[in-house]
A protein has these predicted regions:
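Hydrophobic core of transmembrane alpha-helices in multi-pass small-molecule transporters
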Residues: 123-124, 129-134, 194-207, 266, ...
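C-terminal transmembrane bundle
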Residues: 33, 37, 199, 234, ...
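Hydrophobic alpha-helical transmembrane and interfacial-helix anchor sites in secondary transporters
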Residues: 46, 162, 247, 400, ...
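Cytoplasmic helix-loop-helix junction between adjacent transmembrane helices
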Residues: 131, 198-234
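Central mid-sequence intracellular linker of multi-pass
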Residues: 46-108, 112, 228, 250-326, ...
Length: 610
């Protein structure tokens, strides 16, 4: 049964109640992104840090009171040309030394009593300074980000499948409950290992919150409003990014910032009590043939939208009786999983292509942001420039995608991203700093647009019965791209050039792949696997509709006045009317004994006439 044309309009369409539910679905996006981007502040390395002086490495005749603070540091810590005091080494003097001139042979050793740090991007302490993750322990910083992204990958895959089995609401409530509890537990971490495991687990649950709210939001909209609803949720994410630096300055310590970021998740637990602010998706209920639940859901939506499901004679029976006649009384729920994509041709191809484009969109951003770091080492310059380009990407999608189509704008974003990357790769040493900055900003803008549009496009073209699992696979590929930057940092950026070459090549290759995608602009969401398989890519070049029209060979079916929809509606209404005892009128018919034959009946009529 077609939900978009036969069910959705009769429940009020994108009415008042649908709008209210969509508004409440934006708040989880803010809470999730607040916890996601706080990871940037947890792992940023201070610009200034050095070893703490160790008196045990100094000779017994040394008196610190005879030296100034800077002189004391110069005697105990090596000075590196161009970078100031050494980050990881100390001077060790002979025990009986009395001459502290540079001619004295001094041994360089690793730090022994810890480090002294400057202020960390608004925070006084973070994950790095809490456990001294510098020098030989630097590798634990990218490892933390890899663990966090691994949690998101597992969450997208597992909870995406769970979203198709349990429903959008149940998956959301399960994820929000566990993510809030894990967020509180992260504040109490007492070691690096505990912090890594808790962040991995919380990332998995945050992925479930984001995925379930994203899908539920789009399934409650009609085609003209889907894009704007999705992009407004993106602005909520941007607002969370803009708010984080101020929160970091106010909180000062990372456990306090983590607690503040967890508060919105705790507030979302109120969705347990208020089922009306985040109801189950009626589209998913109908697609999985949960007839009793979908009837209650449709009645709730129609009532809150101010529309009654009414028949010409009996209220509330036209749409519901059509559902009964379409599915039958003994219909059992039927659930699907992403494993069924093995039997499809179009759906898995679309899923693979959009996973590839999202992987490129997130992975190639590291190449552009690294050029920004080369232009300015200021943390806030790169951070706010990234936020501004994200906002511009949202605005670009809002203004262009509904006019030129999803596929066309995705293709344009991939082309500009690839060109920017190739120009930076080939001409960086020949370009001035301003041109490098412009190309990096343009590439960052369109790579973010590529990532946003890939996720939105995937949610539109995947069928309802496997939308959670398929979108989870696509978003998981995006997290793999985000984790690729940490892999480069784990190798001390030794493979950056190869990383840039690979992603630039992938961006060019994605241009060809995008041509194979269908167009979903102003089209209903597919519900079944059959609907997903029926999607076809539009022709690359426009052609006349009657170009291949041969009238003599055209076999048109004879016109008929028969309409199966009207007939089924008439049959269902008649059946309902005949089963009622209190009919609106009764037809008076003469009583006739069933035992009388036709001849006896004719004789009785002649006697009456005589």
């Amino acid at each position: 049964m077609d939900y978009e044309t036969k069910v959705f309009p009769h429940t009020g369409g994108y009415g008042r109640y649908n709008r209210v539910v969509v508004v409440f679905s934006w708040f989880p996006n803010f809470a999730v992104m607040l916890n996601l981007f706080s990871d940037v502040f947890y792992t940023v390395i201070p610009d200034f840090y050095h070893c703490k002086p160790d008196p045990r490495l100094l000779p017994s005749a040394f008196l610190p009171s005879n030296f100034s603070r800077q002189g004391y540091l110069n005697l105990t810590i090596p000075w590196l040309n161009g970078s100031g005091l050494s980050h990881c080494e100390l001077f060790k003097y002979p025990p009986n030394a009395s001459d502290f001139s540079e001619k004295l042979s001094r041994q360089r050793v690793s730090c022994t009593v810890g480090w002294e740090y400057g202020q960390v991007a608004g925070l006084h302490s973070n994950f790095v300074t809490e456990w001294d993750l510098v020098c030989s322990d630097f590798w634990k910083i990218p490892l933390q980000h890899i663990c966090f992204m691994t949690g998101w990958i597992l969450g997208y895959i597992l909870l995406g499948t769970l979203c198709d089995w349990l429903g959008r609401r149940r998956c959301f409530l399960l994820s929000i409950s566990l993510s809030s509890l894990l967020g509180v537990a992260v504040c109490l971490s007492n070691s690096v290992v505990v912090f890594l495991l808790l962040r991995l687990s919380q990332g998995a649950m945050l992925a479930g919150v984001f995925l379930s709210s994203y899908i539920a939001r789009l399934e409650l909209c009609d085609p003209p409003h889907r894009l704007m609803v999705a992009m407004i949720s993106g602005f909520f994410a941007i607002f969370a990014e803009l708010l984080l630096p101020g929160l970091a300055v106010l909180c000062r310590d990372w456990p306090v910032l983590q607690a503040v970021a967890t508060v919105p998740l705790l507030l979302l637990l109120s969705y347990w009590c208020c089922a009306s602010v985040f109801p189950e998706s009626p589209r998913w209920l109908l697609a999985t043939a949960q007839i009793h639940q979908v009837k209650r859901s449709l009645q709730e939506f129609s009532g809150r939208n101010g529309v009654c499901l009414r028949d010409e004679i009996y209220p509330g029976e036209t749409l519901l009786s059509e559902i009964d006649s379409a599915y039958g009384e003994d219909c059992r729920p039927a659930y699907s999983s992403v494993l069924e994509l093995r039997r499809t041709r179009v759906i898995w191809k679309n899923c693979l292509i959009l996973s590839f484009t999202l992987f490129i969109g997130t992975g190639i951003q590291y190449c552009f942001t690294r050029n920004l770091h080369g232009y300015s080492s200021n943390f806030y310059f790169v951070y706010f420039l990234r936020v501004i380009t994200g906002a511009l990407a949202c605005i670009f999608i809002c203004l262009s995608v509904d006019h030129f189509g999803r596929r066309g704008m995705l293709l344009l974003s991939a082309i500009i991203t690839g060109l920017s990357s190739l120009l930076l790769l080939a001409l960086t040493q020949y370009l001035q700093g301003g041109l490098v900055l412009v190309l990096s900003v343009v590439g960052l803008l369109f790579s973010q647009a590529l990532a946003m549009l890939s996720a939105f496009f995937a949610c539109e073209v995947m069928p309802t019965v496997v939308r959670g699992g398929c979108l989870g696979l696509v978003l998981a590929a995006g997290c793999v791209g985000m984790a690729a930057s940490s892999l480069m940092e784990l190798q001390n950026n030794s493979g950056y050039f190869l990383h840039h070459v690979v992603f630039a090549s992938f961006a060019v290759l994605s241009v060809l792949c995008i041509m194979l995608l269908p167009e979903s602009k102003r089209k209903p969401l597919p519900d079944s696997l059959k609907d997903g398989e029926s999607q076809r890519r539009p022709s690359l070049f426009l052609s006349r509709p009657d170009r291949d029209n041969l009238p003599l060979l055209c076999a048109r079916p004879p016109s008929s006045d028969y309409n199966p929809d009207n007939y089924s509606r008439l049959v269902s209404a008649t059946r309902r009317m005949l089963t009622k005892d209190n009919l609106p009128y009764r037809t008076a018919v003469p009583t006739r004994s069933p035992l009388l034959s036709h001849s006896e009946t004719q004789g009785q009529e002649n006697e009456v006439i005589a």
